[in-house]
């Protein structure tokens, strides 16, 4: 869960 370090929205889609 790298939402705090990465821009929540780009990584959120990849992690999800």
Swiss-Prot record:
Role according to the record: Has antibacterial activity against E.coli HP101BA (MIC=9.6 uM), K.pneumoniae PTCC1388 (MIC=10.6 uM), M.luteus PTCC1625 (MIC=6.0 uM) and S.aureus PTCC1431 (MIC=8.1 uM). Has no or very limited (<3%) hemolytic activity at concentrations of 15 ug/ml and 60 ug/ml, respectively.
According to the UniProt record, one GO cellular component term is:
extracellular region
Q: Which family does it belong to?
A: Belongs to the histone H2A family.
Q: What is the lineage of its organism?
A: Eukaryota, Metazoa, Chordata, Craniata, Vertebrata
Molecular function GO labels: protein heterodimerization activity
Q: List the disulfide bonds.
A: none
Q: Where in the cell is it found?
A: Secreted
Q: Tell me the first and last residues of the signal peptide.
A: none
Q: Which UniProt keywords apply?
A: Amphibian defense peptide, Antibiotic, Antimicrobial, Secreted
Provide the GO biological process annotations.
defense response to bacterium
Primary place of residence?
Answer: secreted
The tissues in which it is expressed are: Expressed by the skin glands.
What's the protein here called?
Buforin-EC
């Amino acid at each position: 869960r790298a939402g705090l370090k990465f821009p929540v929205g780009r990584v959120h889609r990849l992690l999800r």
